[in-house]
Amino acid sequence: MQPQIILITGASSGFGKITAQMLSEQGHIVYGTSRKPSENIGKVRMLVVDVTNSISVRQAVEQIISEQGRMDVLINNAGMGIGGALELATEEEVSMQMNTNFFGVVNMCKAVLPYMRKARRGKIINISSIGGVMGIPYQGFYSASKFAVEGYSEALALEVHPFHIKVCLVQPGDFNTGFTDNRNISELTGQNEDYADSFLRSLKIIEKEERNGCHPRKLGAAICKIVARKNPPFRTKVGPLVQVLFAKSKSWLPDNMMQYALRIFYAIR
């Protein structure tokens, strides 16, 4: 396979770092982004990019086009999570969540699409989440941001189909990455007597599942397959088998049963 010019956001750690390394090892020319200056990862060229800043995004894409002449694959991986009750989240917390996880994806796509349209080819891989299929308690705005990515990607795939541009969604379950330790916790939730106990029980379960989750190379391997395939599937679920099967069951399981199962799993009582 001809080496691809690939840009992956959020490549300084976790999924992004491992996936960038794996793609580079396969012979692709890989650029990674991070919000802060970061050393190159092997042959992966790191760029300082704030995905919430359209000017920063556009400058990075223009630099790659200037150096390589094209953009073959964009992987929107940059993301963050805020834990807490929906009612108590501040406007600043909600904006931070949506700006990074959703509008960051929008900014990146808007920057690369003119070049992909001109070339009449390209591939955009948006990292969503199983939390983008079902609302996770005390991760509500994270789920909302991923639901937004899902809807955006569905519409985008239709709009860019005439230009032979593929849009794909990857829905990870729980993986053992630095995401757990980097989660932002809303202080107001822990201080509220009505929510505190329920929140702490659920958070303990969430963090345990993440720490016992799959190795991130499993996700990296799935992304590498999508990059390699001419006609990849629109959606790919990756993670612990139980989580993948549960997410798939939403399409046929009655809503009240799904809600009941989630309450039991996350100790909502």
From Swiss-Prot:
GO biological process, alphabetically ordered: 3-keto-sphinganine metabolic process; sphingolipid biosynthetic process
Signal peptide coordinates: none
PROSITE patterns: ADH_SHORT
Catalysed reaction equations from the record: sphinganine + NADP(+) = 3-oxosphinganine + NADPH + H(+)
Keyword Magnesium: no
GO CC annotations on file: membrane
Pathway: Lipid metabolism; sphingolipid metabolism
Top class in the EC scheme: oxidoreductase
Entry GO MF terms: 3-dehydrosphinganine reductase activity; NADPH binding
Transmembrane segments: none
Binding site for NADP(+): Y142, K146
Motif range (GXSXG): 10-14
Keywords: Lipid metabolism, NADP, Nucleotide-binding, Oxidoreductase, Sphingolipid metabolism
This protein's record includes keyword NADP: yes
Pfam families for this protein: adh_short
Sites where the protein binds NADPH: G10, S12, S13, G14, K36, D50, Y142, S143, A144, S145, K146, F175, N176, T177
InterPro entries: NAD(P)-bd_dom_sf (IPR036291), Sc_DH/Rdtase_CS (IPR020904), SDR_fam (IPR002347), SDR_oxidoreductase (IPR051911)
Active-site residues (renumbered): S12, S128, Y142, K146
Superkingdom, taxonomy of origin: Bacteria
Assigned EC number: 1.1.1.102
PANTHER family: SHORT CHAIN DEHYDROGENASE (PTHR43976), SHORT-CHAIN DEHYDROGENASE_REDUCTASE FAMILY PROTEIN (PTHR43976:SF16)
The family this protein is said to belong to: Belongs to the short-chain dehydrogenases/reductases (SDR) family.
Role, per record: Catalyzes the reduction of 3'-oxosphinganine (3-ketodihydrosphingosine/KDS) to sphinganine (dihydrosphingosine/DHS), the second step of de novo sphingolipid biosynthesis.
Protein name as it appears in the record: 3-ketodihydrosphingosine reductase
